[in-house]
Amino acid sequence: MCAVCLVASCEPRVGYARLAANLCYDDCETALDGGESPASPYLEQLRQALELARAHQERRIEKGAVIIERPDITINLEGAGENITVSLDEDPLAPKAHLLVSELMVLTNAALAAWAKEHGVTLLHRTQDVAIPKEFSGIWQTPLEIARVVKALAPAVLETNPRPHAGLGEAMYAPSTSPLRRYPDMINETQIISLLRDGKPRWSKEELDTLLPLLNAHLDAAGQVQRFRPRYWKLLYFKQQGDRWWPAVITDENDAFVTVNMPKEQMIVRARRQFFGERTHPGQELEIRLGKVHPLQNDFQLLETREI
């Protein structure tokens, strides 16, 4: 790593890592803030890693990265069967710890992608080879900001060609750091380990290209389940809360429809313009009432709005 936070070289090795401690985000955040926690003995390493993470993020933003930050929501279930009660909590903030992990993950995956290209190893790359307006680079946190930049971004695709990922601000990106959670990461790690151990990758480019359609179909199906699962519990939460007013923000509009974001619950509802006042505009805060809520049908409707 050079002074301007560019990876000078990457040399992966196969070996065993000895875990010194099992630390959570909250403990690391407490230590970085100067408090006592199980992570305190490793404070110097955490500080060095955080400094690297901050420098790496700044470099990515300079190269056009679009970074979206929103709080994580924990869905709590109490009871069983028809007696389940749903509640939502916002996870404790740990921005330094999350930044440390996410940036080192991006750095590693980008470095491995470049190493693989240099050594002729085909990996599965996450690409977004599009031009993003310069004004969209940066860190976005409010519902209106997030809606604006997401609308302008083309979705990333999985392919075997090492092309740029504009949203990440990386020349190439091959996800490899989470082989236990993501199938593309497992394939990429297998390719890397096979080359290091056997002198050749496990699969050829042609074999991975043949695998991609089936893999993408399975990933899309799994993604639908992962998106629907928390959405189902949130819809059940709305239904259990009964008739009440919910804080919301308008994020988009056209002649026929208005899109509303519920920031705390991280849900979006779209309704006809007739439900809104004449002065409706993106960024406007208001309160909404929900009408019919169908958790199993993955649907809910806006019933009424009022300005605040």
Predicted features, each with a name:
Residues 1-308:
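Electropositive polyanion-binding surfaces
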